[in-house]
Amino acid sequence: VCCRQLVRAFIQAGGKLIVWHGGSDAALSVNSTIEYMTNMEKSVGAENAAASTRFYVAPGVDHCEGGVGEDKTDLLTALDQWVTKGIAPATLTAQRVDANGAVILTLPLCQYPQCPRYIGPANNAANDKLRSSYACTSPGVEPKLEI
């Protein structure tokens, strides 16, 4: 109860909150975070939640980092732009880097419940590593594919 009151007060005061969760986190279930965000939205109202919060699930990412997914995302800059310039984040960019820090793959990091879907040309190994080859889609909605 106390946490809900704190979050409600934070949002009512104009606070901004970005929540990120690794989709393959074995330590903390993403389902618990989905439930928390759903309850928070009910508590503060859908309009207030949409104006003050963003929720991202990083597919294939373990607890905080690692896994098969793209675990590098600049959430701090997104939050700073939102707070200082009023530019609310939408789709962010998630990256996978090699041991030397070189980017080897970029994908869109979609707002939950959307997820990235490949829309690029078939049988093109170079394009499957490009953010532009993916679109955020809602569950059950098929994206328009490039042919």
Predicted regions and their residues:
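C-terminal His-loop and adjacent cap/lid subdomain of alpha/beta-hydrolase
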Residues: V1-I147
